[in-house]
Amino acid sequence: MTLNSDADPDDPEPAAPARDLSKPASKPARSTRKSSSAKSAQGAEGEPRKTPGRRAPRTPASDYRIAEQPAFVLHSYPYRETSLIIDVLSRDHGRLALVAKGAKRPHSALRGVLQTFQPLALSWSGKSEVRTLTGAEWVGGMLPLTGGALLCGFYVNELLVKFCAREDPHPQLFHHYVVTMTRLAHDEPPVQVLRSFERVLLRETGYAMALDRTVARKAVLAEGRYVFDPERGVREAADDLPAQWPVIAGQTLLDMEQDDYHRAQTVAQSKTLMRFLLNTYLGGTPLATRQILIDLQNL
């Protein structure tokens, strides 16, 4: 059953949050029509009249309406007195901000549906930075996250908010998000699940590089010692390289390339490497949930 948003048709769409603005608002085109007296003057002077240009066809209203799109809620925050703005990851449209009008009302059908870590089918309309949610359906089929798995889920959601630009679809990343939530719900080792997701996230957003070959196109050797240049990739360890680049065993890099985390050394060094890379690519911006995980579970 699809639950319709309690949207009031006369309510305006909210302005985009300031931190998410990436495109200047378009300005209405000025009228270029000339008065009849001006046209007559042109005719009198013998200048040829210009044929009015054809107007660009209007975008069909259906292009601004999306129905039953697979999606997950990443984050939500209050908007006005009775509404929410939800940050969602959708399969075919990437990360979007939607206003759920009336979702905070006591008897709103949306209150129990717009939950994190649950597969949803969302419908929305509009073309502004913040679309209007018009319907939400709980799809089901996934176990809820609890305990440490719940903290890991919030960490994954925060990474998506930090790394994924608005309206930049990543179907493979969406698929891996579903896989990650399923693995966490089934109590698979969090370290392996998180490292696997982090690598997919970096690859899909344009940061990841191969771990089994160096920048000099040499094969990584299990017994070798290496560092990871954030701009170029794996390099052989040397004294003249930046001290903040962690030294990683070749075996760790090979294990990570194969998504294999059964060795204790690989678990420890992969955590150090990924923490360094995420911090570098985020420009030093701290991850709130990462610190919680470090404090509580030392992940």
Curated annotation (Swiss-Prot):
**InterPro entries attached here?**
ARFGAP/RecO, DNA_rep/recomb_RecO_N, NA-bd_OB-fold, RecO, RecO_C
Per the UniProt record, one Pfam family is RecO_C
Q: One biological process GO term for this chain?
A: double-strand break repair
Could you tell me which residues belong to the region Disordered? 1-62
Q: Which UniProt keywords apply?
A: DNA damage, DNA recombination, DNA repair
Q: Quote the cellular component terms of the Gene Ontology held in the record.
A: bacterial nucleoid
Low complexity bias (residue ranges):
25-41
In UniProt terms, what function does this protein have? Involved in DNA repair and RecF pathway recombination.
Give the protein family: Belongs to the RecO family.
Kindly provide the name given to this protein in its UniProt entry: DNA repair protein RecO
Taxonomic placement: Bacteria, Pseudomonadati, Pseudomonadota, Betaproteobacteria, Burkholderiales
